[in-house]
Swiss-Prot record:
SUPFAM superfamilies: YbaB-like
Predominant location category: cytoplasm
GO cellular component, one term: cytosol
Location of the protein in the cell: Cytoplasm, Nucleoid
Entry keyword DNA-binding: yes
NCBIfam families according to UniProt: DNA_YbaB_EbfC (TIGR00103)
Bridged cysteine pairs (disulfide): none
GO molecular function: DNA binding
Pfam families membership: YbaB_DNA_bd
Name of the protein in question: Nucleoid-associated protein HAPS_1040
The protein's role, per its UniProt record: Binds to DNA and alters its conformation. May be involved in regulation of gene expression, nucleoid organization and DNA protection.
Organism: Glaesserella parasuis serovar 5 (strain SH0165) (Haemophilus parasuis)
């Protein structure tokens, strides 16, 4: 049922993958991603843990409508979160690649 190595081999693979995933999560938390809105007028940089690191607002927005600037900050933050999530999925997929799971079993369990 479990192929070469049996259940013991599968458990060893799972333990190794867990260690790799923990290391990858630590690395991801250190990475930074920047989201933009308003054609780059507002930029929000977050880390892999979705903590806001920096907000950049083009000075021309300060002369305009406050409500528009607030909307652009929210849109840039949401763009940064989306990009961070995509980056995290790509990085984690590389960790689970190559593990021979039984048919129908997915990770994380």
């Amino acid at each position: 049922m479990f192929g070469k190595g049996g259940l013991g081999g599968l458990m060893k693979q799972a333990q190794q993958m867990q260690e790799r995933m923990q290391k990858m999560q630590e690395e991801i938390a250190q990475l930074e991603v920047t989201g933009e809105s308003g054609a780059g007028l507002v930029k929000v940089t977050i880390n892999g843990a979705h903590n806001c690191r920096r907000i950049e607002i083009d000075p021309s927005l300060m002369e305009d409508d406050k409500e528009m600037a607030e909307d652009l900050v929210a849109a840039a933050f949401n763009d940064a979160v989306r990009r961070a999530d995509e980056m995290q999925k790509e990085k984690m997929a590389s960790v689970t690649a190559g593990m021979q799971l039984p048919p129908g079993m997915k990770f994380p369990f």
